[in-house]
Amino acid sequence: MKFDIQNDFLGYHSEWNLGSPGGWDYQRITQNIGKAVWDRILRISDPGVDLDFLHPLLYPVYGFVDMLVAVHRSREGTAPGLIAVVAEEETLVDVTENINLAGHLSAVEGITGALMAPHELELCDGKVSYRGQPVSTIFMDFNSDILLDLHRKHDLTPALQAVREGRVVNPRGTEPINVKSMFEVFTGPLGKHFCEETVRRTPWTRRFGERSALGPDGQEIRDLIQYAYRNWDNLVLKPERGYSGMGVRVGGVNEDAGEAIELALSKGDYILQEKIPLNLWAEDNPAVDPVARSVVLERYQTDFRCLMGPGGLFGFLVRFGGVPTNVGSGGGVQPLAVLRSGMTVREAVERVNAAVMNIEYGDLREIVLDQEKMALDERFTYLLGPIRMAIRPRIITPGHLTALERYCRCMWTDSQVLEKMWLEGALDDYIGIEKEELEIARMQPWKGGPAVFASDGLFSFGAHPEDG
C-alpha cells in the first residue's frame, strides 16, 4: 500500500515513559495561549487555513483526570473521597502542573484533590490518610528509585502500604520495564513477540559496554565500543534511566566521541542508539529576533509526546527546540491544531509561516510579549521565566489522529507483553535495577490496569524540511 503522509506519519519514538510522565496539563495551557495568539495573527495576516485548536485530544489532562476519578469510583463507588497528588517536597510550590491537577480533581463532584509530599501521608486506624482523611487513590509524580531514596530518609510506610493496596498510579510494577534498554528487546531476537508498528518505529538500540552485538543491518559487531567510535556521527548515547536530556550525547551535535563514550562507560547503564536524521523531525517556524529587530524563519527540532491510558489516547504534548528538545535543556512548547482545510500539511504550514513572516516586527513582537505575559499569569515558567512557546501551531490532520491512536494501542499492548516477560524472568538480562526497588515493583503489578504512559516521538506529519 502506498504511504499517505496525510493519514500516517514518519519517524520513530526516541523513548517511552511508563513511570510518571508529565505534560498532560501543560498542553492545555499551551493550547489556550496558542489560540489567543492565533486569533491575533488572523486579524493582522490571515493565511486562509482553517485550524481546530479545541479538539479533545489537544487537552490530555481531562482524560487523565477522568481515569483517576474512575480509579476512585472502582474502589469507593459513588462515595466522596480524596485523591492525593504526591510529589517531591521541593517541587510542591513550583510545579504548576501538579498544583493544577489537584484543582482539576477538586472540581469533580465528590472528589477532593490534594497536593502533598510523600512523608505527609499517615496511617489513621490502619488506613492510608492525609490530615486524618482516608486517601482512595494516589498519583505519584516520581519513579520508584526516588521513592526508595526518600524512604531511606523518611519513614514512608504509609506510601508503601498504598503501593501494596494498589492505590498508586502509576502502579510500581511498570518500573522494571520503564528503562530504555527495552528498545533492545524490540530490535533484537525477541522483537517477534511485539506489534510490527512498535518494532518499525523503534531505532536500533543496544545496552552499551564491552560486548558483541548485532548491528542495525543484522551484521555482527564484535566490539560495540569500537563500533561507537567508528560510527559516532550516526549514533546516540543515553542513560538507561533519566530525564530532561541529562547525560545524553548525540553524534554530530556532540562532536567529541571520546568524551561521550568515556562518560557512558564511567557512569554505566547507558544505551547506544541509532540517530534519527535531524531533518525528519525538524520544522521551520517564524520567530522574532530582538537584536536584528526582524521576523526570521528558524529551524527547530520537534518532539511529539503521546499520552495514553487503558482506554486509549489522552492526547499530546508538543515540544520544540534544539537537541534534545526537553524544557530542562532549553526547549519549549508548541500549540497543536487539527487541519480542517482541504490542503496538505506542508501547504498549510507554508501558508501560516508566510502569513506570520508578513507581520511587521513591532506588531509580532507585541504578540510575543503578550504570549509571555499569559504564560506568566498561568505560572507557566521554568527557572523563573516563561517557558518558550512557538508562535505558530504544529499542524496535523484527522487521519494522523487515527494513525496515532493505532500506534498507541500497540504501545499499550506491547507494554503488557513486556511486563509478562519480566514476570516470567525473560528480561532479567536487560534490567539493571536494585533488589529493593524490584521488591517494590512486585508489590503492585500493573497487568494493564490504570496508568498514564508516554511515548516521545521524533515524528513528521508532512512538514519536515526537504533540503536537510
Regions found by a protein language model. Give the residues of each.
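Preference for protein termini
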Residues: 1-468
